[in-house]
Amino acid sequence: MPFHFSKVMKGQHSEFVAAAWLIKQNYLVYNKTQDNDPMDLVAIERVTGDVLKIDVKSVSFRKTWKPGTRICRVPSKYQKQLGVIILYVYPDGRCDFHGKD
């Protein structure tokens, strides 16, 4: 029987994959400290000091209406005020930022 991630486990896995990907992109990565934080990761580019506030999302694909297309997630109003951006994590480990594919 194949292993199946629970929703929480899938989210945690995606956060670790995203952190590893960001480290490879030359970022320092800091994890959230509370369950209901508006962001999952804070990443600081090592050379420029640019700061990214990131909400990590596991990619989901539509099963009906345009099957196979990615479901686009939208930051909440509060996340938008804070400048949080979405980082998608695909099942194969690829990552990309919302709107920057």
Describe each region flagged by the PLM.
Residues M1-P38, V42-D101:
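Mixed-charge (Asp/Glu-Lys/Arg
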